[in-house]
């Protein structure tokens, strides 16, 4: 069994045909984590005892013919998603010793399908960043080049799937945090429509943007995970009441003949790497040869997406993170002589540089005298961006675009340049602003052998359209999934 090319669908066949047991499969992944994760550093914690127990329970169900598609499948969870009785650190000193008293709804749904959870993966602190360098505990490396970043903030999840240290993973996407690392690590990452997956148990960064999404090796594997975790949840007020008439995994079949794709001209301007652009146009040629129609269109408001996103998300973060004060829970500073000193010192020592930067930006934009000048304008831009996409979807089935303007950069390259780091999300943040579904999958490799990602974005609740488009392209893409040489 070549674990480096194994997919969820293939593992399901092996398990159901009794060619391997759930316990053997789980131990294979745990052994690989023990051997290789010292190089990649994708995991913050490995839940070995829990995984082995879950594998035993899964095998019992398989033996009785009661397995779901995810029964016995080893997965990982980003460490800002809660699992009862395990640490949820958000890669922050502030929550270094926090043990979650409850389990996120999305994880509960995986438990209900008897998936096996191998551990919690690394991220940028509180999911704020695009390189996973902002973690308080370790820097995750890109499996394709250990001197480069895996992307972020779900860099640990993308790297562990790319390195075959799990068959799939749950990440969170606030401004591209599932899709951008998936692009950098050569795997598939999917952000669902806002509200399709419950946010209950996801530690909040920016509540009107945050969304849990799957990362896996194939489009179909992502669809299988989404089938498990989606659905209405009364514990989340923003959860959609949406009745799905068929599974997402069933939508990966069928061709795209006659599909109309729109390509925003604003994503083809200065700043787009030449090799990424070349790969994009080769992908367009491939889609056209499959019977699809591709047309460039203009959406001028997209040039304002990055500043609007960082203003709004930072404002929400400054509110959400105000709860961490060293009193009820979280890091508490020593030798404080007053209550005010306790709060100030605890937050100063508990939060990292990037988190502090965004709290300051958010607090500033919400302050009296600046609210109208900055935050209110950003809200207006949100409406304009949503309207722009709505208009585009009257003409096109799917919007097509690069996932990132460049391939994975060197560790430390952008550490002292917040603007350069923010611009890595230039093609992804508008999707979160509008609450749309989007999927990134590999479409090529640059001259250094680094993966390039292509994104398909759909209308609200248009997951089936983007799964169909992505799966059709994936089936024709000659290179498909490359195995990183680690």
Swiss-Prot record:
Heterotrimer of A, B and C subunits. Belongs to the amidase family. GatA subfamily. One of its GO terms (molecular function) is glutaminyl-tRNA synthase (glutamine-hydrolyzing) activity. The active site is at residues 78, 153, 177. Its EC number is 6.3.5.7. Pfam families: Amidase. The keyword Protein biosynthesis applies. Keywords: ATP-binding, Ligase, Nucleotide-binding, Protein biosynthesis. One of its GO terms (cellular component) is glutamyl-tRNA(Gln) amidotransferase complex. This is Glutamyl-tRNA(Gln) amidotransferase subunit A. Gene3D superfamilies: Amidase signature (AS) domain.
């Amino acid at each position: 069994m070549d674990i480096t090319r194994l997919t969820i669908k293939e593992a399901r066949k092996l398990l159901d045909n009794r060619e391997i047991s759930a316990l053997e499969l789980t131990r294979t992944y745990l052994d690989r984590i023990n051997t290789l994760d010292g190089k990649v550093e994708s995991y913050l914690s490995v839940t070995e005892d829990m995984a082995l127990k879950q594998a035993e329970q899964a095998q019992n169900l398989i033996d009785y013919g009661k397995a779901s598609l995810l029964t016995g499948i080893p997965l990982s969870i980003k460490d800002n998603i809660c699992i009862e009785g395990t640490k949820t650190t958000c890669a922050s000193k502030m929550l270094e010793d926090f043990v979650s008293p409850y389990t996120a709804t999305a994880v509960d749904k995986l438990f209900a399908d008897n998936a096996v959870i191998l551990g919690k993966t690394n991220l940028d602190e509180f999911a704020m960043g695009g390189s996973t360098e902002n973690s308080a505990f370790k820097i995750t490396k890109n499996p394709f080049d250990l001197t480069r970043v895996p992307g972020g903030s779900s860099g640990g999840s993308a790297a562990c799937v790319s390195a075959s240290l799990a068959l799939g993973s749950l990440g969170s996407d606030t401004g591209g945090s599932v899709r951008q690392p998936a692009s950098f690590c050569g795997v598939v990452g999917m952000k669902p429509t806002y509200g399709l997956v419950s946010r209950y148990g996801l530690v909040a960064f920016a509540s009107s943007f945050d969304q849990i999404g799957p990362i896996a090796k194939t489009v179909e594997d992502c669809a299988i995970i989404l089938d498990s975790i989606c659905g209405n949840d009364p514990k989340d007020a923003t959860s959609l009441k949406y009745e799905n008439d068929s599974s997402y995994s069933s939508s990966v079949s069928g061709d795209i003949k006659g599909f109309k794709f729109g390509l925003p001209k604003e994503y083809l301007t200065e700043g787009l790497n030449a090799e990424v652009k070349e790969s994009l146009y080769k992908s367009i040629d491939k889609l056209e040869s499959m019977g699809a129609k591709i047309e460039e269109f203009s959406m001028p408001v997209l040039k304002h997406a990055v500043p609007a996103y960082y203003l709004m998300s930072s404002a929400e973060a400054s509110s959400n993170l105000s709860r961490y004060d060293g009193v009820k829970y979280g890091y508490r500073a020593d030798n404080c002589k007053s209550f005010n000193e306790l709060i100030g010192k605890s937050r100063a020592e508990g939060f990292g540089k990037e988190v502090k930067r965004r709290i300051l930006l958010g607090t500033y934009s919400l302050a009296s005298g600046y609210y109208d000048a900055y935050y209110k304008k950003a809200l207006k831009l949100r409406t304009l961006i949503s309207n722009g996409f709505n208009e585009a979807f009257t003409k096109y089935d799917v919007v097509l675009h690069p996932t990132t303007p460049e391939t994975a950069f060197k560790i430390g390259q952008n550490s002292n340049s917040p603007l350069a780091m923010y611009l890595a999300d230039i093609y992804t943040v508008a999707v979160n602003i509008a609450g749309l579904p989007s999927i990134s999958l590999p479409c090529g490799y640059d001259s250094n052998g680094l993966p390039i990602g292509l994104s398909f974005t759909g209308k609200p609740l248009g997951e089936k359209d983007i799964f169909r488009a992505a799966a059709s392209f994936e089936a024709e893409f000659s290179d498909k999934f490359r195995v990183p040489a680690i």
